[in-house]
Design a protein with these regions (language model features):
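Bacterial Sec-dependent N-terminal signal peptides
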Residues: 1-14
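Repeated scaffold domains used in trafficking and secretory/extracellular systems
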Residues: 2-4, 53-58, 94-104, 138-147, ...
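Short coil/turn segments that connect the beta-strands within blades of beta-propeller domains
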Residues: 11-12, 63-65, 104-105, 150-151, ...
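Conserved beta-strand positions in repeat-built beta-propeller and related beta-rich domains
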Residues: 16-24, 68-72, 109-113, 155-159, ...
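Structural motif
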Residues: 23-30, 75-77, 116-118, 161-165, ...
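Short loop/turn segments that connect beta-strands within beta-propeller blades
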Residues: 34-36, 80-84, 121-125, 168-172, ...
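A short beta-strand motif characteristic of beta-propeller blades
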Residues: 38-51, 83-90, 126-137, 173-178, ...
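Solenoidal tandem-repeat scaffolds enriched in leucines and small polar residues
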Residues: 125-228
């Protein structure tokens, strides 16, 4: 039975992208109703009679649509968030990771295994250009999450990288870069215009190196590191997120941790303890 109920109201639910297994093509989309506390699985497949694809990496809401980035299928689907039906797609991407909207007609799409960030027109579902990322080859190319400060977009470079890039959105050029620790995995901007990124430090035997992870606070205006919070070897922090007020950080390090953005040290006790499960993704209810 592929019938699925149409949602009478948007704004009271949570979309969950289920990555699936790399090269198995078994990614799915689920919808959790926060009012009824019920979940619908396979909503994309049931609404469109087609599979979502190979590795559902991320999803962004913009312009009344849900934009699902399917990494190893080289595609971004735009769906109606009420009916879950596809309304368009952007194809011929290399290995997309995240999409950041500048306007109704311009967005950036980060990639892995490509030394370019793609420029797309979401209104026409077309690729319109590229941003060359310095110091990368196609094989080592890796750009991830994006935040914006004025006319500049900042992006963290993750796999076998150790930098943040600063992009001028008027020229679509990289105008500056900042070295941080090995493999910054995520990037957010707090209410004080401070960026936060967390590194995983690589792994033992990595050709790129291995070090203890760190959490960095970076001033968006000066693009300089203000604070480095060091973890110990063996830690594997990831998934930095902010609350709705953008004054409190959350991140995964086996447990879930919570930290005010004005703190001068990392917390010593977790917010939610690890209990017979493996935390992998994290999102914070803005309310």
């Amino acid at each position: 039975d592929r019938e699925i109920a149409v949602r009478p109201e948007v704004g009271h639910g949570l979309f969950i992208t289920n990555e699936g297994n790399f090269q198995y093509g078994n990614a799915t989309l689920s919808f959790y109703d926060t009012q009824t506390r019920k979940i619908d699985n396979e909503v994309f497949f049931r609404a469109n009679d087609q599979k979502l694809g190979d590795v559902a990496q991320s999803m962004t809401m913009y312009g009344g649509l849900g934009w699902i980035v399917v990494n190893n299928s080289h595609v971004i689907f735009a769906i109606d968030p009420v009916t879950f039906k596809e309304v368009g797609r952007i194809t011929n991407l290399t290995s997309p990771r995240y999409i950041h909207f500048l306007s109704d007609e311009k967005a950036y799409v980060t990639q892995i295994w490509d030394n370019r960030i793609f420029i797309v027109n979401p209104k026409r579902f077309e690729i319109t250009g590229y941003i060359d990322c310095p110091g990368m080859t196609m094989e080592t190319g890796s750009t991830e999450q994006m935040v914006q400060y004025g006319k500049y977009v900042y992006v963290n470079c993750w796999s076998y990288q150790n930098r943040l890039l600063k992009i001028d959105t008027e020229t679509d050029k990289v105008v500056d870069e900042l070295v941080v620790g090995i493999q910054p995995t995520s990037l957010v901007m707090d209410k004080y215009d401070k960026m936060w990124t967390i590194t995983d430090g690589g792994y033992e035997g990595s050709p790129y190196g291995h070090e203890a992870p760190s959490l960095y606070r970076i001033d968006a205006a000066t693009f300089r590191i203000e604070k480095q919070f060091k973890f110990k070897f063996g830690d594997w922090p990831s998934e930095v997120q902010l609350n709705g007020g953008r004054d409190t950080l959350y991140f995964i390090n086996n447990d879930i941790w919570r930290m005010p953005v004005v703190a001068d040290h990392v917390p010593v006790r977790p917010f939610l303890k690890y209990k017979q499960t493996k935390f992998y993704g994290l999102s914070i209810d803005p309310n």
